[in-house]
């Protein structure tokens, strides 16, 4: 069974934690990780880009001049694409980029990502993160003790003092276990769990 050292916020080792092999030492399926990241980024797209076609441009639909007898090419209306200020031909219109991934594949992707992080020694486990007050300075000190400047912190429950202390630190993000996602796991230099959040993630991904 996989094991990791457990530290306190003073950077001292206080014990060990056994990790579920089914979650943290599973087969790494990189294609699933790639697919999950691609879907997550696609679903962030607003898809609201739009231009006016000839039907949407304001103005008359009257012919600018008669069909015959002028010596010029025939024209339908001044809203046509060839006129300045006319509608755009075949321009972009709003669309949805949403993609989906079934629950089984999504869980497998999370297990693969966590296993990859474990194999690459990018996981840190703390016994708890209890901040008595909101203090960015104190939390920066905790991170510096582990030589970190880019980290994802995963908690098992809402931790208001921690969230407020971390929100103004560049390249640091605090997530509850319910919000754990592939993109953030892959983005940060290191992922910091508490013991309770490890157990909660294991419970969610083993079931």
From Swiss-Prot:
A GO BP entry: translation
Keywords: Ribonucleoprotein, Ribosomal protein, RNA-binding, rRNA-binding
UniProt GO MF annotations: rRNA binding; structural constituent of ribosome
Cellular component, GO, one term: ribosome
Region (Disordered): 59-78
Gene3D superfamilies in the record: 3.40.1370.10
Keyword RNA-binding annotated: yes
Keyword Transmembrane helix: no
Annotated function: One of the primary rRNA binding proteins, this protein initially binds near the 5'-end of the 23S rRNA. It is important during the early stages of 50S assembly. It makes multiple contacts with different domains of the 23S rRNA in the assembled 50S subunit and ribosome. Forms part of the polypeptide exit tunnel.
Family per similarity comment: Belongs to the universal ribosomal protein uL4 family.
HAMAP family: Ribosomal_uL4_B
Quaternary structure (record): Part of the 50S ribosomal subunit.
PANTHER family hit by this protein: 50S RIBOSOMAL PROTEIN L4, LARGE RIBOSOMAL SUBUNIT PROTEIN UL4M
Protein name: Large ribosomal subunit protein uL4
Organism expressing this protein natively: Geotalea daltonii (strain DSM 22248 / JCM 15807 / FRC-32) (Geobacter daltonii)
